[in-house]
């Protein structure tokens, strides 16, 4: 069944554009109480109801934990039976606000769900405990295999209601990985929290450097493919259409065709190509025609890893034109090139914030990579990561990507031995691990909500 949700007209007071101040939430987290979700129906008729309810609850709590705005009261502290209804007294079987106020809850999330055939109906009510008012209530419906999506959608709505800014819980990640223990690297798509992993390439080769189109319906990537009548593999650029399940070859000039990045319109791709000798940055259409060269040396220099700003006005890239690789920014037409990073001996993989005001990048210093952010004009550089391996040696933190709301950074780290995906706040705080296995992940790229 196609996923859908319906908004119930349950508002008990005028909608508040912002209840929680995002900046203040950094200093003091809002205290939430979330009792287990109630099942409405005959348990014997739906033996899978417990697993569905557990998954809904787990996803909601995990999402809101990752948001970093909230702390949670343990269920052992609850004074009321969790089987009480989702509405307050005097409703039959209603709960009492005083029971939640006594244990320090600022907001109470009460939810219930039912199952009709293959459809799950989730109904959630959020209450301000101090004012004893309903903040909002919504009903979400979808097939049982989309229970996670129901929970993600509620969490996005919850954050939008309380902070004025939607969450990122319906976003996806595209990444290169050797999952399955293969000697090859293929391209995978997963939910932002590491669930629902789907392999989208099967080149049985090295597929790297994936990039989302602006609408997250296409993925550009590079794969080292075998050419006909040749023993060598070439780094060719492909685009994969997720909805149609089709792919096509975009750039296959001899040499490098890599580091693709879509422009905001989705009509053009910026990539690194060595078709004229040394690697330079080119702009091409999605069918590989209308090629425009944007950088030209200097002689012997490499210009790689293009990243178009979300507003479409600038392009960041890595270049060793002054000796060591550093990050540069230029106008989208290739003019007015300016070096903006000076972190250690090697700076690479620039990634723009959604507002086009900041860049994140990986910088090599003291024999390891860390993630840094810097303003687009080169000011206010900040180190985001610093981690060690179990043996005490410095770990590498690489390949940053901003969340669509600009509040979070995703990156890879080899602190556990293999390169796993992590997320932190923009200041590096509250770092959390996304993937938990023994495979390696490279260059994750974070989409907007889908």
Per-region residue spans from a language model:
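A structural "domain/chain start" motif
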Residues: 17-66, 179
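Short, solvent-exposed, polar/charged sequence segments at loop or secondary-structure edges
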Residues: 41-58, 65-120
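Short loop/turn segments that connect beta-strands within beta-propeller blades
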Residues: 130, 191-195, 241-245, 285-289, ...
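Residue-level detector of Asp-centered blade-edge/turn motifs that repeat once per structural unit
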Residues: 168-169, 214-215, 264-265, 310-311, ...
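Hydrophobic beta-strand positions that form the internal "hydrophobic ladder"
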Residues: 173, 219, 266-269, 312-316, ...
